[in-house]
């Protein structure tokens, strides 16, 4: 039934024993001339004259009609070229299906370890997975998803060319900018400040990215309780999953050397909402704290001491934001279920990070170390200076490090002293050359339209010296452990998916946290990532092929689809024969 396909030089894929495919594409990326409809033409198999051989195909190739045809438009586009390259890459790695030559195998390549080591560790040099990677294994077709994972660079380039993907990113960014305008203001200030002072910010990209994520998360979560409007967006979180048994890790040891079998799962929460526990109204400035002359440390101490009261009246809802090309929620249940699970992971992570501040402190340090970062290395002084100038709460807080005072975090205070030094003495030179006054962004009050204020470098001269306690990632991990402990204790069991069409939030789904469902999903996803099972293609029904395969990049070269569609055709013929025979009796 599955005889070897013959492909003519123009891409027609011909199965001599069965039928001719039109509007198809070969595995090497050759595109086939489109017809108005994708017909299948039966070739009578009981008539030898009806079977096309190599000579017949050669005659077809030389018909004048084919000499005047031009390649399809898709092959001339950047998207078409990337797609051809991706298909060739996946074919080379997975190989052809030995039972169905010319089509890609639907089993993991032999000789490779498992997707986690093949893709994350060896290919991307990342010793971690993401929540998205766990949730997208089963949200659509697991086969397609892992073809994409193994060709991640090309797949991402193709995704970035798609209009809807770009539109979705813009919506997420506009929501973040609306809630946290200080981020763009900080970037603009830093660009101008470095240019005017002729300073450079020589900092490792991975360190810079992590530092920004940690700094922004602390600042946004603190603002959630102070001057914020009851919302925080783009908050990092993480947890661990066991490499051996695929279970989410609930309790961590404090040393990374004892947790090597646990893989980090990282995520970014789209939206947190602080609301009244009883009437569900959004809470603005729930802690009723005046932030003037305050510091991160003072605010965190206040929140921790009043946590019981905060918890009795308030809760925090975790939301995931999904953008749509039409104002309708997905019709496929597995897609909605995947979004629900994604939000459940975030809930679990915050619960994990709110059990014990010392454990959470070490958890963040392990996260940084797994990224190859030195948690004891002093952070770039210029980076810290920009934080000091633009964030008074941070500036007031790090005075403790400047003077060698404790920050009221036992794990950090016992761990902070080291041989490294943190020296900002060089910034004294700025006072003798160039401008010393700058407009910096400020957090706006509702009754104020001012978005900047003028500061002088001379006002911060006390920082331009050698600090008694070096400023390292450990300081940020300590403050993160405190604010995550507070937020985690307030996280609601109600979770939410927000659907956006353009900038309109047209529908929300609220659902309960289900730890049993989450545990089952985590284990099943871990098994495929860590090599405990093979990929699960979609159930081979015609409805599924029509639904899942319609826009799939691999639809023309997928052996699973091809083989099972042939079986469905044969089954249809058998049923037709049975019906005819029954009607003749």
Swiss-Prot record:
Q: Which residues bind [4Fe-4S] cluster?
A: 141, 549, 552, 558
Enzyme Commission numbers on file: 3.1.-.-
Write down how the cofactor binds this protein: Binds 1 [4Fe-4S] cluster.
Kindly, how does the activity depend on pH for this protein? Optimum pH is 7.8.
Cofactor section:
Mg(2+); [4Fe-4S] cluster
Instruction: Supply the enzyme class, top level.
Output: hydrolase
The alphabetical list of record keywords is: 4Fe-4S, DNA-binding, Exonuclease, Hydrolase, Iron, Iron-sulfur, Magnesium, Metal-binding, Mitochondrion, Nuclease, Transit peptide
Q: Which GO terms describe its cellular component?
A: mitochondrion; nucleus
What are the BP-aspect GO terms?
interstrand cross-link repair; mitochondrial genome maintenance
Q: Which domain of life is it from?
A: Eukaryota
More info? Present with 1420 molecules/cell in log phase SD medium.
Q: How does it assemble?
A: Monomer.
Give the family this protein belongs to, as stated in its UniProt record.
Belongs to the EXO5 family.
Q: What does this protein do?
A: Single strand DNA specific 5' exonuclease involved in mitochondrial DNA replication and recombination. Releases dinucleotides as main products of catalysis. Has the capacity to slide across 5'double-stranded DNA or 5'RNA sequences and resumes cutting two nucleotides downstream of the double-stranded-to-single-stranded junction or RNA-to-DNA junction, respectively.
Protein name according to UniProt = Exonuclease V, mitochondrial
Q: Report which gene this protein is encoded by.
A: EXO5
């Amino acid at each position: 039934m599955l005889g070897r396909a013959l492909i003519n030089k123009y891409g027609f894929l011909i199965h001599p024993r069965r039928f001719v495919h039109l509007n198809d594409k070969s595995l090497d990326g050759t595109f086939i001339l489109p017809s108005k409809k994708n017909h299948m033409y039966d070739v009578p198999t009981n008539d030898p004259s009806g079977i096309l051989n190599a000579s017949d195909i050669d005659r077809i190739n030389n018909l004048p009609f084919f000499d005047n045809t031009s390649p399809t438009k898709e092959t001339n586009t950047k998207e078409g070229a990337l797609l051809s390259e991706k298909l060739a890459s996946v074919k080379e790695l997975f190989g052809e299906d030995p039972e169905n030559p010319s089509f890609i195998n639907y089993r993991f390549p032999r000789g490779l370890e498992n997707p986690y080591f093949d893709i994350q560790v060896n290919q991307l040099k990342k010793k971690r997975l993401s929540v998205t990677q766990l949730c997208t294994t089963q949200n659509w077709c697991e086969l397609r998803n892992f073809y994409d994972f193994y060709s991640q660079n090309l797949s991402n380039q193709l995704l970035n060319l798609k209009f809807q993907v770009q539109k979705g990113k813009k919506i997420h960014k506009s929501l973040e900018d609306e809630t946290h305008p200080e981020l763009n203001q900080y970037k603009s200030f830093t660009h101008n400040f470095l240019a005017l002072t002729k300073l450079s910010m020589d900092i490792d990209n991975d360190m810079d990215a992590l530092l920004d994520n940690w700094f922004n998360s602390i600042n946004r979560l603190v603002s959630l309780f102070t001057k914020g409007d009851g919302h925080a967006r783009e908050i990092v979180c993480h947890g661990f999953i066991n490499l051996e048994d695929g279970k989410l890790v609930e309790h961590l040891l404090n040393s990374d050397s004892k947790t090597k079998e646990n893989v980090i799962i990282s995520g970014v929460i789209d939206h947190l909402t602080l609301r009244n526990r009883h009437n569900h109204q959004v809470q603005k400035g729930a802690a009723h704290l005046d932030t003037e002359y305050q510091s991160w440390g003072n605010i965190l101490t206040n929140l921790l001491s009043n946590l019981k009261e905060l918890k009795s009246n308030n809760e925090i809802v975790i939301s995931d934001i999904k953008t749509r090309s039409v104002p309708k929620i997905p019709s496929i249940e597995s897609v909605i279920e995947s979004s629900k699970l994604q939000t459940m992971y975030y809930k679990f992570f915050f619960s994990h990070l709110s059990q014990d501040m010392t454990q959470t402190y070490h958890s963040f340090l392990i996260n940084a170390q797994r990224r190859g970062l030195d948690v004891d290395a002093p952070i770039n002084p210029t980076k810290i200076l920009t934080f000091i100038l633009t964030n008074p709460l941070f500036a007031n807080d790090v005075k403790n490090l400047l003077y060698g005072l404790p920050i009221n975090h036992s794990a950090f205070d016992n761990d902070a002293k080291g041989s490294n030094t943190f020296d900002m003495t060089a910034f004294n030179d700025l006072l003798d050359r160039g401008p010393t006054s700058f407009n910096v962004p400020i957090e706006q009050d509702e009754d104020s339209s001012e978005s900047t204020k003028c500061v002088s470098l001379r006002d911060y001269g006390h920082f331009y010296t050698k600090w008694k306690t070096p400023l390292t990632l450990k300081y940020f991990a300590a403050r993160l452990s405190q604010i995550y402990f507070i937020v985690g204790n307030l996280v609601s069991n109600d979770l939410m998916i927000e659907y956006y069409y353009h900038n309109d939030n047209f529908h929300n789904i609220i659902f309960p946290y289900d730890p049993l469902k989450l545990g089952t999903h985590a284990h099943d996803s871990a098994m495929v990532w860590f090599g405990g099972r093979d990929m699960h293609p979609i159930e081979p029904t015609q409805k599924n092929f029509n639904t899942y395969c319609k826009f799939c990049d691999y639809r023309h070269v997928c052996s699973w689809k091809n083989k099972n569609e042939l079986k469905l055709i044969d089954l249809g013929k058998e049923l037709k024969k049975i019906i005819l025979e029954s009607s003749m009796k």
